[in-house]
């Protein structure tokens, strides 16, 4: 059996390629040749060309047929067309920007994606909603026009080793710099789906393993547990020698240093349903997300991006600690100036009689008996 991977050198690529080789596929990867990551088996054939140039891709693949082709890079719709009639099972990788509200929360009414969003959720239908998302949605349509039995996998934000936009670096560097505080918006309660590299590769390989189920289907991919932003920060701090710091919660409008972590102009949730891939293909995380975050943090600490380098430029995080300290000081001064009102009859609003946790109503019985 022969397999082709277009790309194969990004964060999830080597895991997918190794999985194909382990399954007995004679595997070829088509990529630019600029990156040759560790972990690609020696037996893998490399075709070096420009995956964004259809004519060069056509020339590189002239006269070849593959049992499986996985397109993770390049001009996805054109590669689907080029491989029409020349592949047994075409798999493509896209992303969550296809969903209305993912990149532009205001495209939904009220703002924000439905939680969770299923594969049949509303997609971007007009460039005014989001230009990138519109192109992603149209690309999906073109893929299935060229490959009616394709499997399309929608990726979330990817994290793990060799991620060129490592969101976790905004946390890890502050720990390495021994920062005593980190600013989070609205208590860090935002939820945003992410996927660890090994978990996403596992999802792709499940679709390869079960073509009778996966052909003609679209699947959301991601970790099964979605951690809040605060949980992400606390998990990474624990993994890095229990770094002691204070999480300073501010309203989103003031928490400007947290923008690179939230990665959108709102704190709306971005969570999808994994029910389809779980029930149809049996997906389960191979690496629990909390362990995956710890691995990612330790990898970043050992492979530190250059200060002011490409990764930090992509993240748009200036790591301006003096400005952050001034913001914290000003915010706390403003909070201290707020006087709470005197409540009518001395009774402040409560949490409701149904709540019986810490700070709630006392137990009606002193004992269980």
Give residue spans per PLM region:
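N-terminal Rossmann-fold cofactor-binding loop
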Residues: 29-34, 51
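A short helix->loop->beta-strand "cap" motif at the edges of active sites that frequently abuts
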Residues: 85-90, 148
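Conserved beta-loop-beta element that borders a ligand/cofactor-binding pocket
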Residues: 139-162
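Mid/C-terminal beta-alpha module of Rossmann-like enzyme folds, strongest
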Residues: 209-276, 280, 294-295, 307-369
């Amino acid at each position: 059996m022969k397999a082709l991977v277009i790309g194969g050198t990004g964060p999830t690529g080597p895991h997918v390629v190794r999985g194909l080789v382990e399954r007995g596929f004679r595997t070829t990867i088509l990529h630019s040749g600029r990156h040759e990551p560790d972990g690609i088996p020696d037996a893998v054939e490399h075709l070096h060309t420009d995956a964004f140039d259809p004519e060069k891709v056509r020339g590189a693949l002239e006269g070849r047929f593959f049992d499986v082709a996985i397109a993770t890079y390049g001009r996805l719709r054109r590669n689907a067309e080029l491989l029409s009639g020349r592949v047994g099972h075409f798999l493509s990788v896209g992303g969550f920007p296809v969903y209305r509200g993912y990149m532009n929360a205001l495209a939904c009414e009220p703002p924000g994606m439905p939680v969770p969003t299923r594969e049949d959720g509303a997609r971007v239908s007009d460039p005014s909603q989001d230009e990138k998302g519109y192109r992603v949605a149209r690309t999906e349509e073109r893929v299935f026009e060229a490959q009616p039995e394709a499997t399309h996998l929608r990726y979330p934000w990817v994290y793990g080793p060799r991620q060129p936009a490592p969101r976790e670096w905004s946390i890890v560097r502050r720990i390495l710099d021994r920062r005593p505080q980190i600013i989070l918006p609205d208590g860090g309660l935002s939820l945003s789906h992410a996927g660890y590299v090994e978990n996403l590769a596992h999802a792709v390989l499940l679709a390869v393993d079960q073509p009778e189920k996966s052909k003609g289907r679209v699947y959301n991919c991601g970790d099964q547990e979605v951690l809040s932003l605060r949980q992400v920060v606390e998990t990474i701090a624990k993994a890095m020698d229990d770094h002691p710091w204070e999480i300073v919660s501010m309203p989103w409008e003031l928490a400007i240093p947290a923008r690179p972590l939230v990665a959108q102009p709102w704190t709306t949730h971005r969570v999808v349903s994994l029910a389809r891939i779980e029930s149809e293909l049996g997906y389960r995380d191979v690496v629990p997300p909390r362990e995956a975050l710890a691995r990612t943090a330790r990898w970043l600490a050992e492979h530190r991006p250059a200060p002011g380098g490409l990764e930090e430029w992509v993240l748009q995080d200036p790591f301006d600690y003096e400005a952050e300290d001034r913001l914290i000081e000003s915010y706390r001064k403003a909070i201290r100036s707020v006087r709470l009102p005197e409540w009518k009859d001395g009774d402040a609003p409560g949490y409701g009689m149904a709540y019986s946790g810490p700070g709630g109503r006392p137990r009606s019985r002193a004992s269980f008996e």
